[in-house]
Swiss-Prot record:
Basic residues bias spans: 383-395
The protein's name in its UniProt record: Cytoplasmic 60S subunit biogenesis factor REI1 homolog
UniProt xrefs under PANTHER family: CYTOPLASMIC 60S SUBUNIT BIOGENESIS FACTOR ZNF622 (PTHR13182:SF8), ZINC FINGER PROTEIN 622 (PTHR13182)
Subunit structure and binding partners: Associates with nascent pre-60S particles that have not yet entered the translating pool, and is released from mature 60S subunits.
PROSITE patterns named in the record: ZINC_FINGER_C2H2_1
Regions of compositional bias (Low complexity) in chain numbering: 192-204
S-S pairs: none
Keyword vocabulary terms for this entry: Cytoplasm, Metal-binding, Repeat, Ribosome biogenesis, Zinc, Zinc-finger
One annotated GO biological process: ribosomal large subunit biogenesis
Region entry Disordered, spans: 101-151, 163-204, 312-361, 382-401
CC per GO annotation: cytoplasm; preribosome, large subunit precursor
Organism, scientific name: Chaetomium thermophilum (strain DSM 1495 / CBS 144.50 / IMI 039719) (Thermochaetoides thermophila)
Length: 537
């Protein structure tokens, strides 16, 4: 009887039991598999697998590494490019820009001009002499130092050792290859032999004929000052006391040309052109003369002795000040008080009030004191023709206009109205709220004159026989009736006919009043009512 084990075929042991499903390769032992897991090829295939891309073989990966090395070397060569055009004195750090410059018309014209110029008469321009280079380009035939080779090898190793979790790029920008130590020492020796001659600026001489704003040259200092005053608007303070105009102009010249400082605000710039542009843009053309320091700065060019009192400037203090080089601009002098006889009055040192200082009038009576040399103005008011009571003629006409017999002067009757010669009255603005009222039924001067005439006629008719005017106020037209006979009399209103006539008259009166009111309202809408302030009250 055959057993099961005997019937089975012997199992074959695989030669490469360890595999990598990502790269689709197999290995004989685990050591090779673990080494493959740490290689750049496997890491690159892992990245492609994450991106859903198929894996690549080791040959394709090697080609990609060589291409990356070539690109890195080209970038390093491009970054280290530096060439200088000797004709144009310009340095270029890009090969394309250098080629474009060589093919430009400007470079060719300068090269042709340099070829025609004799070699012994070549003189550098000011601009070319001031140009400098940041570094000398590396020579093609120089021996490259071993440190540069090590740096490039480190870059290549970094590509191999790159991992997925690395955040920074393993490629590091290499520096330009440095020449060997022997070549560097030769270059240093040549630079030491070349003498460095820096031109020293010549000492500037102050000029009183040069304009500090536009560099205009004038024949004389006086014409220079006139030019700056008329053209630029410069103001010289205290010109009547100026004794040294030339010294003042030189002082301003040194301040601008030597110290590059603004005359007005004191701001400093890098050169003369910058400070002149600043003064022109800001209109800083005047010389400051407000504070004591500013006055002392230019005080040596002035002479104020003519403003001193006699003998004041001949004291010892002035002599001492002149020896020390100081300048006196004048001191405060005490005021002298002289009485009527011309004698000097000594003032009280402590400042107490005297009898002459205090007023001899009461404070309450000060408003009634007339002006000195004039009598009270109210006494002359009655003598004025406009307010005279001796003139019997009417003050105004019937229409309210001033009578021609009166002089036409604008006068005040009170504090709120001004009566003009034309007859109109101008009200005070404090009463404007009342003047703005639209009074439709305000009577005109003609209507008021008519009413006054009617009232005067009625008053004359009611006068008594003796000529006495009846009592003003509410008139009592009803007769006094005793209480015992009240109601016995018969009035006219008890008659129906009389009552009808009276009611009809009242209706007509109301009708006329309504129609008149409607007409007045229509007129008031079409044309503005006259201002009440124009009427004479």
């Amino acid at each position: 009887m055959a057993t099961i084990a005997g019937s089975r075929a012997p199992t074959e042991v695989p030669s490469h039991p360890y595999t990598c499903n990502t790269c689709q390769v197999a290995f004989r032992n685990s050591e090779l598999q673990r080494g493959h897991m740490r290689s750049d090829w496997h890491r690159y295939n892992l990245k492609r697998r994450v991106a859903s891309l198929p894996p690549i073989s080791s040959e394709v990966f090697t080609e990609k590494v060589l291409q990356a090395r070539a690109a890195t070397t080209a970038q390093a060569d491009k970054a280290g490019f530096e060439k200088t055009c000797e004709v144009c004195q310009k340095t270029y750090y890009s090969e394309n820009s250098f080629r474009n410059h060589l093919s430009s018309t400007k470079h060719k014209s300068k090269a042709a001009a340099a070829a025609r110029r004799p070699a012994n008469n070549k003189v550098d321009d000011d601009v070319s002499s001031m140009s400098f280079s940041l570094g000398e380009p590396a020579r093609a035939d120089s021996v490259v130092d071993s440190e540069a080779e090590e740096e490039f090898s480190e870059v290549v190793e970094g590509i191999k050792n790159a991992s997925i979790h690395d955040t920074a790029s393993p490629i590091k920008r290499p520096s330009a290859p440095q020449p060997a130590v022997e070549e560097q020492s030769k270059t240093d020796a040549q630079m030491e032999e070349t003498p460095t001659t820096t031109p020293k600026p010549e000492a500037l001489t102050p000029s009183a004929t040069t304009c500090v704003f536009c560099n205009y040259e004038s024949p004389t200092p006086q014409l220079n000052a006139s030019h700056m005053e008329r053209i630029h608007g410069m103001f010289i303070p205290e010109k009547q006391y100026l004794v040294d105009l030339e010294g003042l102009l030189k002082h301003l010249w040194e301040k601008v040309f030597r110290y590059n400082e603004c005359l007005t605000c004191g701001k400093m710039k890098v050169n003369v052109f910058a400070i002149q542009t600043h003064m022109r843009d800001k209109s800083h053309y005047h010389i400051p003369y407000t504070t004591e320091e500013e006055q002392l700065e230019i005080g040596e060019f002035y002479d104020f002795r003519s403003t001193y009192s006699d003998g004041d400037w001949e004291t010892e203090e002035e002599d001492k000040g002149e020896e020390d080089g100081g300048v006196r601009l004048g001191a405060k002098r005490e005021s002298k008080v002289v009485d009527e006889n011309g004698d000097e009055v000594m003032e009280d040192e402590e400042g107490w009030e005297t009898d002459s200082d205090a007023s001899s009038l009461d404070t309450d009576d000060l408003h009634a004191v007339p002006a000195e040399g004039h009598y009270h103005q109210y006494e002359r008011l009655g003598k004025h023709p406009h307010h005279s009571r001796e003139n019997k003629k009417a003050h105004r006409e019937a229409d309210g206009i001033h009578a021609p017999s009166k002089r036409t002067h604008a006068v005040y009757y009170d504090e709120y109205e001004l009566h003009l010669p034309s007859g109109k009255s101008v009200g005070h603005r404090s009463l404007a709220r009342y003047y703005r009222q639209n009074l439709y039924h305000y009577p005109t001067p003609e209507e008021r004159a008519e009413r006054l005439a009617i009232e005067a006629a009625e008053r004359e008719n009611r006068m008594d026989v003796d000529g006495e005017e009846p009592e003003r106020g509410r008139t009592r037209t009803r007769a006094l009736v005793p209480r015992d006979i009240k109601g016995l009399g018969v009035t006219t209103m008890s008659d129906p006919r009389v009552r009808g006539i009276v009611q009809k008259g009242k209706k007509e009166e109301w009708k006329n009043r309504d129609s008149k009111w409607w007409m007045h309202s229509q007129v008031a809408i079409k044309e503005k009512a006259k201002h009440p302030s124009t009427y004479l009250r």
